[in-house]
Amino acid sequence: MSQSSIIVVGGGLAGLMATIKAAESGMAVKLFSIVPVKRSHSVCAQGGINGAVNTKGEGDSPWEHFDDTVYGGDFLANQPPVKAMCEAAPSIIHLLDRMGVMFNRTPEGLLDFRRFGGTQHHRTAYAGATTGQQLLYALDEQVRRYEVAGLVTKYEGWEFLGAVLDDDRTCRGIVAQNLTNMQIESFRSDAVIMATGGPGIIFGKSTNSMINTGSAASIVYQQGAYYANGEFIQIHPTAIPGDDKLRLMSESARGEGGRVWTYKDGKPWYFLEEKYPAYGNLVPRDIATREIFDVCVNQKLGINGENMVYLDLSHKDPKELDIKLGGIIEIYEKFMGDDPRKLPMKIFPAVHYSMGGLWVDYDQMTNIPGLFAAGECDYSMHGGNRLGANSLLSAIYGGMVAGPNAVKYVNGLESSAEDMSSSLFDAHVKKEEEKWADIMSMDGTENAYVLHKELGEWMTANVTVVRHNDKLLKTDDKIQELMERFKKININDTTKWSNQGAMFTRQFSNMLQLARVITLGAYNRNESRGAHYKPDYPERNDDEWLKTTMAKHVSPYEAPEFEYQDVDVSLITPRKRDYSKKKVAK
């Protein structure tokens, strides 16, 4: 048998951790990224990473962390993998510490932990307000050790175009495009790990990087992978409104004592503290977002009648703010011109994260043999709503599980991708070259960026904080209209190298497919759970909807087929969420 290898698509935390774990066992890894890996969206994460290390003597434990996570996710997550993640969390934090991550420390020299939403405990390890950057850089240093050893090869500036599937629908490699010279090539591999992040750009403006189109996940969904719980999109309660994008103001601002308020009857009204005395400003994100939305949109009590409320840190010690929140204070000063140490920040909710993603089993493998997924592009850990600072944990943990399981899968194969006929790979390349030629020759009257703006406006208006069935159906009609208009796009720039417009057009067609999964998944789910809220169905309905949504692609112009899979609630019995009272110890 020839030399086996694994391909990892995506260079964020999940992709880098999967690469490290696979290379650790001596497996050759090709790492593909659409941007230099240090620019992956993980670099934008601010607040921290959760783990019940319990240095504060609060009686915290991995079980408490597990309970907070499934409770915060409104019981839609399968419990065994979540429990395993929470049990691994303290050792992941210590591993990162040993890798040299500059975590903040207490005066005694212990790791410091801050409080985040949906918990009563201080369990979030952090490196100022740039935790994602510090973790990403530390993991990249480890990957570079394996690069030097000849085990890892990086392909930065390559876009994933599809998995190579053989006659048995088993994954045997990928097709990718070099974004400098636009050459399309195939790469053989015995397993592929998708770590391509979320689809925030489907909503137009979001807190996500412009590369987070969901295009790669959409491609493998169109190739037959199930897409699970797509309708669960997290809207972060605190972001700076902007004309181009929405800039995240981390939950750590509230974790360090920031207060959310607006004026009511001429006096400051701390509405979260009033309604949820036990958790105050640190209720889970879906709840904080709905309250801010209600205050601004329904009660018309936003600042000066605009859709904004205050996030106030001005009562805190400025020196402490610089040490613990320097990253976000700098961002706010740069883009708003005000000093958050002296004046309250103005914020409003923004599309932030997808709890849904590619369906995976407990080994992080999709329903396509040999195709794994980890990080935000898989659905497995967060149920109906993610707790703050669980994303960095789930990305790293997902990579830690996917890497070794991909190696195990490869070692159990009878035939290697290297033994496959080259005609299989040539056929996949030819198909992608034809698609690219079709895009480059588009000569209609529509503009892909205008169509994308329309999609974003419709999705943000109707498929975010509050959802109504009639509006969801109209949104689906709009997506189908955009699919028709897509055929009439004009590619004015036919440059043969580094062609951004044509690239975006191709990604946009994939975004439209996922937009239907999100919209119709939301339409079908007649209940309110986590981030999915329907005023016409205000209660959670476990009898009918304690189920994972699984979308299956039919054809480009047909609606997806939906199946539903029971959630594994074997460890903690579902109970109603109530954040106005403290959690009763179990």
Curated annotation (Swiss-Prot):
Active site residues of this protein: 285 (proton acceptor)
Localization, UniProt: Cell membrane; Membrane raft
GO molecular-function terms, A-Z: electron transfer activity; flavin adenine dinucleotide binding; steroid dehydrogenase activity, acting on the CH-CH group of donors; succinate dehydrogenase (quinone) activity; succinate dehydrogenase activity
In-chain residues carrying the UniProt-annotated modification Tele-8alpha-FAD histidine: 41
Pathway: Carbohydrate metabolism; tricarboxylic acid cycle; fumarate from succinate (bacterial route): step 1/1
Binding site for FAD: 10-15, 33-48, 376, 391-392
Biological process annotations from GO: anaerobic respiration; tricarboxylic acid cycle
Pfam family, one: FAD_binding_2
InterPro entries: FAD-dep_OxRdtase_2_FAD-bd, FAD/NAD-bd_sf, FRD_SDH_FAD_BS, Fum_R/Succ_DH_flav-like_C_sf, Fum_Rdtase/Succ_DH_flav-like_C, SdhA/FrdA/AprA, Succ_DH/Fum_Rdt_flav_su, Succ_DH/fumarate_Rdtase_cat_sf
Record-listed E.C. numbers: 1.3.5.1
KW Disulfide bond (keyword) present: no
Enzyme class, UniProt record, top EC level: oxidoreductase
Cellular component per GO, a single term: plasma membrane
This protein's UniProt keywords: Cell membrane, Electron transport, FAD, Flavoprotein, Membrane, Oxidoreductase, Transport, Tricarboxylic acid cycle
Catalysed reactions, semicolon-separated: a quinone + succinate = fumarate + a quinol
Requisite cofactors: FAD
Topology with respect to the bilayer: Peripheral membrane protein
Residues binding substrate, per UniProt: 236, 250, 352, 386
Subunit structure: In B.subtilis succinate dehydrogenase forms part of an enzyme complex containing three subunits: a flavoprotein, an iron-sulfur protein and cytochrome b-558. Interacts with FloT.
Family membership noted in the UniProt record: Belongs to the FAD-dependent oxidoreductase 2 family. FRD/SDH subfamily.
Annotated protein name in UniProt: Succinate dehydrogenase flavoprotein subunit
Organism of provenance: Bacillus subtilis (strain 168)
Gene: sdhA
